Structures are given as C-alpha cells and as structure tokens.
Amino acid sequence: MIEFDNLTYLHGKPQGTGLLKANPEDFVVVEDLGFEPDGEGEHILVRILKNGCNTRFVADALAKFLKIHAREVSFAGQKDKHAVTEQWLCARVPGKEMPDLSAFQLEGCQVLEYARHKRKLRLGALKGNAFTLVLREVSNRDDVEQRLIDICVKGVPNYFGAQRFGIGGSNLQGALRWAQTNTPVRDRNKRSFWLSAARSALFNQIVAERLKKADVNQVVDGDALQLAGRGSWFVATTEELAELQRRVNDKELMITAALPGSGEWGTQREALAFEQAAVAAETELQALLVREKVEAARRAMLLYPQQFSWNWWDDVTVEIRFWLPAGSFATSVVRELINTTGDYAHIAE
C-alpha cells in the first residue's frame, strides 16, 4: 500500500515549504448545508462558531443545556478542533416553545442563529464547505504561484486526506489487523472508521496509479464517467470516446475511480482491468470489504476547487479561498501547493 505522503502528485512534488495552521485563525471552515431551516418542526437547527473545541464536545454541551439526551443532537460533519469553524447542529426539541439558545455559553463557542426545522440533520447531509486558509513562512513563491494557477485549470487529485486514516495511520492499521485475524470487532465506531480507511486507501491507490499515465484525463474504454456535481455515472464505450473526451475536457464529465467493496465496481474492459491491477496486492483489504458487505461505489478522480482565489499578504504569506463539495479534503489541495510543516499539517477537516 502506498503511504499517503508518497501518493502521485498531479502537478509534481512541490518545491516549496510552508506552515499550515500556525494558529486556528489560519484555517477557517464555513459549512454549507445547501438549504435553509424550515422555520417549523420538532427539531432546532443551531448555527455555531467555534474555536478550540471539537464538534462532539459542543454537541454534548448543547444537549446538556437543553436537558436532552446526547443522541438527540446531530450534525452533518465533524469539524476540526484546531480551526475556526462555522457549522450547524440539530437538536430534537418537540413542542411550540423555543428555548433561548442565546443563553448557551461554552468557551470557544458562540451561537450565531437558530430556527425550527422539520427533519433531523444527518451525517453527510451537507452540500460542501468554504475554506479560508493562510499559509505562512512559504518558500519558493514562484513555484507556489504557478501551482495556484495550474490548480485553477487542472484541479487536484481527489485523494482522501491523511486524517481519514487516523493518527499515524491507526485506522488503516486496525483494518489490516482485522482483515488478517478475522476477529469480530464489536465497537461500531471502530468498525466504521476501519472500513472507511480501508476503502479510502484502495481508492487513493487507484488514483495514484492513474496519475502516472501521461494524460490523467484521457478517457479509456470502460471508464465510469460521472456528470459533474452529480452522483450518477455511466460506462464509456469505444464508439463514444471522442465525444466523451470532449465533454471531459470541458469539465462536463468527470472520470471516476473505484471505492472497492462488494458487488461490481462499475468500470468495464480496459478501465476495469487497470483498477483491478492497481490494487491487486491488497487482497486482504478487498476481502474484508466484501466480507463486511461494504458496497462498492465511485468517486471522481479529480477535484476542481470552486470560487478559487488567493492573495499574497507578503512574499512568504498567502491567503487562499475555495469551496469544496462534501467529502473532499482541503489538505488534498494544499498538498499540491507546498510541503507542509507544523503539528497540525495533516489534521484539517
């Protein structure tokens, strides 16, 4: 299995270095649900601003304030403790009376707004996230500037970030032990983290191998192509390659890579043979995913940050702004820009 730091770069290995997250204010995340609160219902959506506290900690504190069970407070995604983040929590509080959430006090946390909503906010139920990052002590400004321009045009690999695999790769190591011993794992959280790490690592490996080709965006027979911004996909045939290539070049279609698991992967012929060969050595992880009935899926191979802009504060400090769809990692963007340093270089989302 390729180590995350050794995965293939789309724009070549960065020449410069920089400090990511010198302080929490250098990493700002604003959650985008993609919808507004209903204004009625048995749930309350609460938009919070937090700094220095993780999502679960705030959710538990909110439950205590509302005198409800912790399981009655949900969220669409975890946000990093070591960052300034805006996100929505959802509390189930039936009844017509609206609690005064402006009285909720927690160090490092502020309630920005709240409103009634009809449905529970479930994990993953968000459109995306807007990021504002500040990279400090940047070396080789010219190389970084050119990479910023290239990312606007060509995007970045849609790798799962190192944080998906746990501190020191602990989640992936857990998955490997599980696969090798077949010992039942009772802890539901561990099961989820380990299976997710296994599938994500296989996806990363397939993408890394594809990036070694001369033209990563060259459609091949049997590729599974996804409509940009959509989850649906279809299989490319030889008769359609020229037209499909035009649509990929126009970013209307995206080439996908497999999230291996049980069932068919989605590609056929040449593309399927390539994907299978890319992870042929990882028989234990593949067998684990099939055994645990994790359904195979597809994910876009490349990621095009939206609303992408940057501003150099001085020769060694640059602020970068962009929006990513849910499930994508800001660190996969930064990875193509600089070699990061700092205690939290890999801990982003």
UniProtKB/Swiss-Prot annotation:
Active-site annotation: 80 (nucleophile)
Positions that bind substrate: 27, 129, 329
GO molecular function: RNA binding; tRNA pseudouridine(13) synthase activity
Enzyme Commission (EC) number: 5.4.99.27
Domain TRUD: 155-303
Keywords: Isomerase, tRNA processing
Catalytic activity: uridine(13) in tRNA = pseudouridine(13) in tRNA
Entry similarity comment: Belongs to the pseudouridine synthase TruD family.
HAMAP family the UniProt entry points to: TruD (MF_01082)
Main function: Responsible for synthesis of pseudouridine from uracil-13 in transfer RNAs.
Protein name: tRNA pseudouridine synthase D
Species this chain originates from: Escherichia coli O8 (strain IAI1)
Gene: truD
